[in-house]
């Protein structure tokens, strides 16, 4: 069986934390900020961990990423 390849799109969007969890940036941060209130914009700046339900799928995409 051939080697699995790391999904390059996913690899660029996700970083692994020291404890092995996966950190991602939030969506809705590229434009249309006039429609978003200050609290929402502040919360969008913070990174978020990949949810438990998505973890298995994302780990398959990142087979060899450390």
Swiss-Prot record:
Pfam family membership, one: Ribosomal_L35p
Entry keyword annotation includes Ribosomal protein: yes
Membrane-spanning segments: none
Comp. bias (Basic residues): 1-16
UniProt-listed GO biological process terms: translation
InterPro entries, per database record: Ribosomal_bL35, Ribosomal_bL35-like, Ribosomal_bL35_CS, Ribosomal_bL35_sf
Stretch list, region Disordered: 1-28
Keyword Ribosomal protein in record: yes
GO molecular-function terms, A-Z: structural constituent of ribosome
One GO CC term on file: cytosolic large ribosomal subunit
Alphabetical keyword list: Ribonucleoprotein, Ribosomal protein
Family, similarity comment: Belongs to the bacterial ribosomal protein bL35 family.
Protein name per the record: Large ribosomal subunit protein bL35
Organism: Staphylococcus haemolyticus (strain JCSC1435)
């Amino acid at each position: 069986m051939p080697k699995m390849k790391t999904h390059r799109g996913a690899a660029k969007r996700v970083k692994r934390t020291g404890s092995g969890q996966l950190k991602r940036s939030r969506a809705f941060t590229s434009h249309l900020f006039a429609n978003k209130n200050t609290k929402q914009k502040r919360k969008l700046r913070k990174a978020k961990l990949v949810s438990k339900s998505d973890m298995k799928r994302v780990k398959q995409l990142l087979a060899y990423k450390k």
